[in-house]
Amino acid sequence: MLILLMIKKIAQYCVSMGLIFLCLLAGINLQTWLGIAIPGSIIGLLILFGLMASGLVPVEWVKPSATLFIRYMILLFVPISVGLMVHFDTLLANLAPILASAIGGTLIVMVTLGLILDRMLKKGKKSCG
């Protein structure tokens, strides 16, 4: 009985990981085929989101591996952080534009989302009352 449960759990992880990697592969191939500047991983993420939002892929099918990726996400940033330290002098030389774009972009997103939410809430109140 325990072996069957283990096999079922392993199968769930395999299906989950397979779906995520198939969407990643589809995104990379689509990006290469179309020649657009959006990274293939982002396109794959949007494909996976679209499949889950439309109900073609139930969330439960993706959840095991997604939970695993989220749990160990910090480890995935270590190579990127080390790679940034190689170019520390370049980062330091461009610190002002980097900070300006990060802070400015954050403010633009916050204000835009605030305005959209405000309009949506006002429309919701008008239709209710």
UniProtKB/Swiss-Prot annotation:
State a single Pfam family of this protein.
Answer: LrgA
Segments traversing the membrane: 10-30, 33-53, 73-93, 97-117
Q: Main localization of the protein?
A: membrane
The entry's localization annotation reads:
Cell inner membrane
Keywords per UniProt: Cell inner membrane, Cell membrane, Membrane, Transmembrane, Transmembrane helix
What GO cellular-component annotations does this UniProt entry give?
plasma membrane
**Disulfide bond sites:** none
The residue range of the signal peptide is none
Membrane-topology annotation of the record: Multi-pass membrane protein
Q: Please report which protein family the annotation says this sequence is part of.
A: Belongs to the UPF0299 family.
What name is this protein filed under? UPF0299 membrane protein VC_1233
Q: Which organism is it from?
A: Vibrio cholerae serotype O1 (strain ATCC 39315 / El Tor Inaba N16961)
